């Protein structure tokens, strides 16, 4: 009888192992079957029934799909869609109150998202309102793989925080960066912040960074191989030559920290006027690509700007647009950056004023020499913008944008930025 029991349990164990292997194979096959070669520009689903949306960023997911975040009807919003741009599910965070105050209605919107180890997503948010009458601030939120809310945490202060980026760390917890509202233009409150949260949304630590002015902010963060972090953004000039209260001139700001958020190195790159960074990627060789903008002369327009930096924030190579000779190009910029699967090509998403309104634009660069390879425009009559580029499952790119109708669209291109419309 004992022998029969042993044989039974042994057979059961083998069966469970086989089933587990089949499940793993199914997951791997599902992932390996991704990559439908397609391009399109299409409306986000359910605009007519649920109202228009605004998108901030898109993230590629392992199950042949994507998630995007932004806001809809004044509150944060997340959506999941397949390779063809067809909606899988859609979630609006109605449990978060729409900000109301002395100057009308504001909104709270999702600005960043990252995958979590349990198959869900962590989301960071900002608010449009700083006035105390709104009592509004950004959030960090966790949802499961179906978009169901697991927890929501408001940033810890009675003043507005604006979360700009979030990542899951190699340790499994979360890092958020952004800026917070200071009480005056000239201040010692340090307006940029980095915060670390555990998997349950409990604050582990928060650090503030900056100088004497109120426009210091972080826009993006990545984790270094040693467990520390690099945050990038802008640092406002501070000296007797500059007036925090009026000019707001800034440098591109690169800050390297340890795992506890303590500054190890920082650099400020720029000339006399406006420079800033909006995104950073790891190039895989100990250097980093940054997307931003520069305006080195007050009478000249701002130029889109790609920079390659070493781990200390020193410029190794760079590209920027030439100055325009007319009034066009006043606010050209690169906002988001990805590295293509070849490991050699960086593609930046931004906008370019072509004289007829801002247009959605992609620029491709040799990631290391910073030489421009190609560029592509997706403009139509009227004003447009684009945000949130991601690698696509077929090797192309995917991002959010708005066109002449103001309706939010998903743009899907091939690896050369081309869209074939049939």
Feature map (PLM): residue ranges:
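Bacterial N-terminal signal peptides that target proteins for export
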Residues: 1-10
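C-terminal motif of bacterial Sec signal peptides marking the signal peptidase cleavage site
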Residues: 17-20
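A sequence-level/structural motif corresponding to short, flexible coil/turn segments enriched
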Residues: 22-422
């Amino acid at each position: 009888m004992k022998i029969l029991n042993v044989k039974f349990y042994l057979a059961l164990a083998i069966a469970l192992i086989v089933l587990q292997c089949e499940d793993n194979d199914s997951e791997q096959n599902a992932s390996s079957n991704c990559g439908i070669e397609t391009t399109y520009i299409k409306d986000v689903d359910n605009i007519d029934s649920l109202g228009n949306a605004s998108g901030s960023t898109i993230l590629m997911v392992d199950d042949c799909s994507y998630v995007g975040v932004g806001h809809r009807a004044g509150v944060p919003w997340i959506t999941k869609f397949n390779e063809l741009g067809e909606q899988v599910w859609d979630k609006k965070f109605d449990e978060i109150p729409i900000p109301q105050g002395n100057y009308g209605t504001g909104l709270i919107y999702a600005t960043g998202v990252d995958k979590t180890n349990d198959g869900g997503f962590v989301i960071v948010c900002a608010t449009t309102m700083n006035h105390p009458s709104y009592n509004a601030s950004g959030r960090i939120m966790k949802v499961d793989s179906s978009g169901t809310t697991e927890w929501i945490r408001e940033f810890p202060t009675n003043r507005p925080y604006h979360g700009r980026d979030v990542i899951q760390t190699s340790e499994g917890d979360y890092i958020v960066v952004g800026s917070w509202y200071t009480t005056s233009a000239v201040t010692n409150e340090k307006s940029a912040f980095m915060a670390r949260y555990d998997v349950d949304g409990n604050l582990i630590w928060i650090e503030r960074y900056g100088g004497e002015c109120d426009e210091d902010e972080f826009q993006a963060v990545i984790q270094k191989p040693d467990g520390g972090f690099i945050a990038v953004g802008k640092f406002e000039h501070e000296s007797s030559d500059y007036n925090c209260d009026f000019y707001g001139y800034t440098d591109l700001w690169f800050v390297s920290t340890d795992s506890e958020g303590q500054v190890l190195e920082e650099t400020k790159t720029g000339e006399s006027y406006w420079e800033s960074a909006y995104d950073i990627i790891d190039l895989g060789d100990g250097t980093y690509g940054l997307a931003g903008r520069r305006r080195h002369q007050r009478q000249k327009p701002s130029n889109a700007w790609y920079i390659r930096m070493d781990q200390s924030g020193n410029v190794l190579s760079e590209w920027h647009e030439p100055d325009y000779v007319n009034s066009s190009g006043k606010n050209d910029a690169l906002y988001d950056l990805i590295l293509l699967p070849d490991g050699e090509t960086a593609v930046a998403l931004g906008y370019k004023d072509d004289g007829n309104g801002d247009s959605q634009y992609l620029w491709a660069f040799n990631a290391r020499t910073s030489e421009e390879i190609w560029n592509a425009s997706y403009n139509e009559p009227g004003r447009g913008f684009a945000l949130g580029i991601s690698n696509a499952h077929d090797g192309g790119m995917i991002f959010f944008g708005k066109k002449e109708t103001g309706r939010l669209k998903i743009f899907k291109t091939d690896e050369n930025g081309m869209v074939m419309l049939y």
